[in-house]
Amino acid sequence: MSSSPLTRTAQAAALEASPGPTRRGLLFIVSAPSGAGKTTLVERLVEQTSGLKMSRSYTSRPARAGEIDGVDYNFVSRERFESMVDAGEFLEWASLYGHLYGTCAADTERLLADGHDVVLVIAVQGARKVRAAGVRTSTVFVMPPSFAILEQRLRGRSKDSEPEILRRLQVARDEVAAFSEYDFVVVNDEVTAAVDRLRSIVIAERARRQRMQGAAEEIVRTFS
């Protein structure tokens, strides 16, 4: 018995929105200066978007108060991190603010193979390494509304010393200049609006013809 047109449309929508064995996941990269709010935005995006996972980076830095291993980051010693680098275990890794950060290639591949779309929240230099490796990805740069607001946010979160804040602001000047390397730009002027913009990007990327090819061809066959 053939399915009704409504059922066929529902199947196509499911392929777009949800993970599954018929579809390999999409890889997204979100980068931003420290303090721009990228982690908060992506965490809310994942909460609101089915089939989307946030990759947890590995880092050699000590956990801050309130941070949980395996939830905020995978915290490892510098020696362990360097051994993972030597073993080729990272899709990308970077040195930032005196600490090492990296994305485990096997963890990411496992999620993508299972049909999950994956978001990497990584630095500009890490994003460059992923692109240089020829990995297909959609990239988003999150910008603060202004330098003054970024400085206000960094000081307001009370996580860093004065020298560290000044260091992060200096790095931010170089990072924002890299926005043109990304496919999309989202200005985080208001959290809810910025999350909506990110979600629109995910929805649009899922609907690209190349990614809907199988579902579209299946629908076309119902017209035969």
What is each residue range found by the language model?
Residues 2-4, 200-224:
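C-terminal accessory "lid"/substrate-recognition subdomains
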Residues 38:
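Conserved lysine of the Walker
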Residues 41-42:
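Post-Walker A alpha-helix
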Residues 46-55:
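Post-Walker A helix-loop "phosphate-sensing" segment adjacent to the P-loop in P-loop NTPases
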